[in-house]
Amino acid sequence: MAADVFMCSPRRPRSRGRSVLLKPQVPEDDDDSDTDEPSPPPPSGVATSARAHASAAPLPPRAGPGREEPPRRQQIIHSGHFMVSSPHREHPPKKGYDFDTVNKQTCQTYSFGKTSSCHLSIDASLTKLFECMTLAYSGKLVSPKWKNFKGLKLQWRDKIRLNNAIWRAWYMQYLEKRRNPVCHFVTPLDGSVDVDEHRRPEAITTEGKYWKSRIEIVIREYHKWRTYFKKRLQQHKDEDLSSLAQDDDMLYWHKHGDGWKTPVPMEEDSLLDTDMLMSEFSDTLFSTLSSHQPVAWPNPREIAHLGNADMIQPGLIPLQPNLDFMDTFEPFQDLFSSSRSIFGSMLPPPSSLPAADPSSPPSQGNILPNTALPPASLPNSLITSSAAPSLDPTEGQGCERTSQTVDPFIQPADFGPSEPPLSVPQPFLPVFTMTLLSPGPAPAPVPTALPLVPSPAPTLNPPTPPAFLQPQKFAGVSKSTPVITHTASATLTHDASATTFSQNQGLVITAHHPTPSSSPCALALSPVPQPPAVGPPQPHLTFIHPKPVSLTGVRHKQPPKIVPAPKPEPVSLVLKNACIAPAAFSGQPQKVIMTSAPLKREGILASTVSPSNVVIASAAITRASGVTEFLSHSTSSQPSPVSRLFSPSTVQDSLVKGEQVSLHGGSPQVPATGSSRDCPNSGQASPCPSEQSPSPQSPQNNCSGKSTDPKNVAALKNRQKHISAEQKRRFNIRMGFNTLNSLISNNSKQTSHAITLQKTMEYITKLQQERMQMQEEARRLREEIEELNTTIISCQQLLPATGVPVNCRQLDHMRDMFDEYVKSRTLQNWKFWIFSMIIKPLFESFKGMVSTSSLEEFHRTALSWLDQHCSLPVLRPMVLSTLRQLSTTTSILTDPSQLPEQASEAVTRMGKRSGES
């Protein structure tokens, strides 16, 4: 605690036995020795003494981490225990040290030969001494804040007492202004000469754990760090590093029954509280870890222990690569753990599931695999449908077979009323289903391609997928032709004559012309009770959920026109980086032209408007449950159906949540985030809002289903705020260090933060000393001026009030006459110019005070002027000020020989001014 303090704790180098300090008893968890490394063996000549030394004091084995400690009596609470929360959480004191073994002579003498008289004495315990010594403090104390005494084996009670003593010493030194015998505090800004007189010269070798560290301590910490992680990776070779970090968090930060955290051993504590371990060494240190490292190394900024401001030291972390700007990256364990348990909580028990199709492969039940979906290649082809006036089951089967021959990964559309679906293998892409229902004379169940969960509807009983694959049901469809598309994470713009967009994966769009109806349509993503609907069976839409891509659309040219069609005709589109342009041909009401040409934002020109056009529109979808609106328009008096669809996609957080999309034509807008309301079943033309349910994120962005959870949304916002604040703080720190480097260093090479701060402190000290010198000089000059003024005033007061009588001459000259007179006299004798400067203020006062209106008035004012302005107490300060002005404007003090020339120039300028006026 004084100038230089070294604490020595002799112990066994090879055993993990109990280490004992000579003075205080210590808990085991404060041991920071590198016991994982074997110590160097003693010389061969001293092997016997070393074995005797080890056998003299057998040590008990170290208690395991899970062994229970025996109950003991609590210690007495002292006055300083308010500084910690739990002063009694410590291990029992250990047994005393065997001093007989310590004092045993272990020095061995070696001779070089029989004839040589040279010999060498080596202490066998010399290597042990270096392992047991730990540097506690070097130099003098600077701050009285709490000190953990890292490296010293102290109990909580001793740490509290030492910190109280340090605080009391600081109080005595700085508040009571008296020296204390315990420890002495110094501050770099004191400017005292004896700051560094007792400090040992130490080279700055690294930053992070200590400001100034000896190279031996750095090497020792590095060896402990490497040994610890080698052992950890040997135990967890087959596990990912994210689960390893999670296990460490659970091991280090969980609380026991009494609520107090378990002390962390020093071998593991160095991982938690140092920046040096992760960022202060080069990449070659991680060469042994690269084979077991599937992801980036955990960022030390995310370790909660480093959040304490007292534990952070300036390091090189701001210069390391930072992945915080990639907001879409989630914690690594979510990729491997959360996707395994999502569907278990969503799916009902197997008893409630209907029987699957025997022809379906087993992989069809797994909707979303645990890993990211690979891209599926879809051919650039065209699927045409028959143009017959009516659609029967046979034609529906033909459409299904046509779609099946294109790609096995696309779920075919089912148009049959009661025919079982034709299942195809789909091991990769999740399939979303839509069911179009319209009133008819009889109820008809519509089978879906993915029977998972039964719907609670009383009359219509199509099987229902999970929460994020609910069938989208339409209570009724108007005469217009709505085409609903499911997009992933982009904005599709619409056009009356052409619609273009690009995808990374296929997207199946099936358009139908249902029977005319006047009831509004509603779309829900959760099963809702439907009223009994009658009518012929309507086909349902089946489409594939693609990956999030950026889609480019055509410009808004004119509102799409939707003309009611007399007969239902299905149109199936298979898209992969293709352009879709509906065109009108003779004899065929609908055609779809597909090209694989490069897409332009302007779109592709097409022919005139066909009887039925395809309208594709979506809104910008946010990360958390974005909403896509599809608005259709009709040129007739029929109502405009409004449908809303949740899109389980993930885009950047900068997009506006719930953006509305409205087409030209003045159709009513539906808010993107509307509450659940009842849908009117009457035939009135009114848009019906849809019910919404949580939709999951895409599989490649951790299908955790937490996008609509308010807690997760709030946590995400808080995380973004913290990231922004942390980046701003680091940027300010970096800018501050750059400014300091520009101020204190002339060279452009990068210096460490510790050196920068040290030089900055020295620079500030120098500036403060210079400022103090300047302030002292200014104060001295002000005092000298005041002293001179006081002396002059005292001398003037000693002079008599009256002097030599002067004949009063009448001053009736004007200013120009006065200047002319001064000029003429000065040219004769330059000394008159000095006299003119003295009498000029007197002449000005005479002109302003003496009146010549009458003789009596002139006599009275002249006498008054004499009394006020011509007395010696008034003339003396006036003459003094004139002489001061003469001294400051001329060189009478520095070079009196130039005064005649300056007087001539002054009167010449004065004559010019009077002539100009």
Curated annotation (Swiss-Prot):
Region of interest called Leucine-zipper, as start-end residue ranges on this chain: 767-788
Protein name: MLX-interacting protein
InterPro entries, sorted: bHLH_dom, HLH_DNA-bd_sf, Max-like/E-box_TFs
Region Disordered, residue ranges: 1-72, 347-402, 632-711, 897-917
PROSITE patterns: BHLH
Keyword list, A-Z: Acetylation, Activator, Cytoplasm, DNA-binding, Membrane, Mitochondrion, Mitochondrion outer membrane, Nucleus, Phosphoprotein, Transcription, Transcription regulation
Record's subunit section: Efficient DNA binding requires dimerization with another bHLH protein. Binds DNA as a homodimer or a heterodimer with MLX/TCFL4.
Species of origin: Mus musculus
Region (Mediates heterotypic interactions between MLXIP and MLX and is required for cytoplasmic localization): 830-879
Domain bHLH, chain residue ranges per copy: 717-767
Stretches for region Transactivation domain: 322-445
UniProt function note: Binds DNA as a heterodimer with MLX/TCFL4 and activates transcription. Binds to the canonical E box sequence 5'-CACGTG-3'. Plays a role in transcriptional activation of glycolytic target genes. Involved in glucose-responsive gene regulation. Regulates transcription in response to changes in cellular carbohydrate abundance such as occurs during fasting to feeding metabolic transition.
Pfam families hit by this protein: HLH (PF00010)
Top-level division of the source organism's lineage: Eukaryota
Bias type Polar residues, positions: 378-388, 670-685
